Design a protein with these regions (language model features):
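Residue-level recognition of beta-strand microenvironments
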Residues: 71-73, 141, 155-157, 183
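Flexible glycine-rich active-site/ligand-binding loops centered on an Asp-His dyad
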Residues: 101, 168-185
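Flexible, low-complexity linker/boundary loops enriched in proline and small hydrophobic residues
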Residues: 28-69
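Active-site helix/loop of acyl-thioester processing domains in fatty-acid/polyketide metabolism
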Residues: 68, 100-124
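Catalytic strand-loop segment that frames the active site of acyl-thioester-processing enzymes
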Residues: 60-101
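Hydrophobic beta-strand-centered segment that forms part of the acyl-chain substrate-binding groove
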Residues: 28, 36-46, 113-151, 175-177, ...
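N-terminal amphipathic/basic-hydrophobic helices that include classical n-h-c signal peptides
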Residues: 1-28
Length: 185
């Protein structure tokens, strides 16, 4: 083969290898579920909606937490749920004919669970708002009729900030995961 032909092949593979490095997608496998849900009665609340309302200020369409199943500050874990109904404000428009709970509302539900943990643990009445989210992955759908189980594991708890690993589970399957950072505002 001619010398120039080898030269062009080398250039092609050099360019392709750089291109490949830039556009490689890293696939991240889902984490294990943060709590053993099989050991819990997922239909039994230890905190009902009326008690939640004494701690969490959200109301009407933004009330995203229906109950709490487990609260264990020693282990740094709280488990709650959102019963998703056909009457949710987003059902009509997200997505017509095939309603799917928006991911931002899944995160909001988890954030409200984290706020409950923070306020009960610290006895701080100040508002804990979003300081950030990180490493969020959506892995499944939530539809009307589902019970979205929410799990939050406290990673850091300070006077003005809290960090939680969070997950959402429907029918034993992980539907989202991410880190929620709360800041006193």
């Amino acid at each position: 083969m001619p010398e120039t032909y080898h030269y062009y092949i080398k250039i092609f593979f050099y360019l392709f290898s750089d291109f490949h490095k830039q556009f490689t997608i890293k696939v991240v496998m889902p984490q294990e579920i943060l709590a053993d849900l099989e050991t819990l009665d997922l239909n039994k609340s230890i905190v009902d909606i009326e008690t939640i309302r004494t701690i969490i200020p959200h109301r009407y369409e933004m009330e995203q937490l229906s109950g709490i199943i487990k609260f264990d500050p020693e282990q740094g874990i709280i488990i709650g749920y959102k019963d998703v109904s056909q009457k949710e404000f987003w059902v009509r428009g997200h997505i017509p004919g095939r309603p799917l709970m928006p991911g931002v509302l899944m995160l909001e539900a988890a954030a409200q669970l984290c706020t409950y943990y923070y306020k009960k643990t610290t006895q701080d009445d100040r508002f804990l708002g979003f300081g950030g989210i990180d490493k969020v992955k959506f892995r499944g759908k939530v539809v009307p009729g589902d019970r979205l189980i929410l799990i939050a594991k406290n990673r850091e708890l300070r006077a003005r900030r809290a960090i939680f690993d969070t997950q959402g589970v429907v029918d034993g399957k992980l539907v989202f995961e991410g880190v929620i950072i709360g800041m006193v505002v």
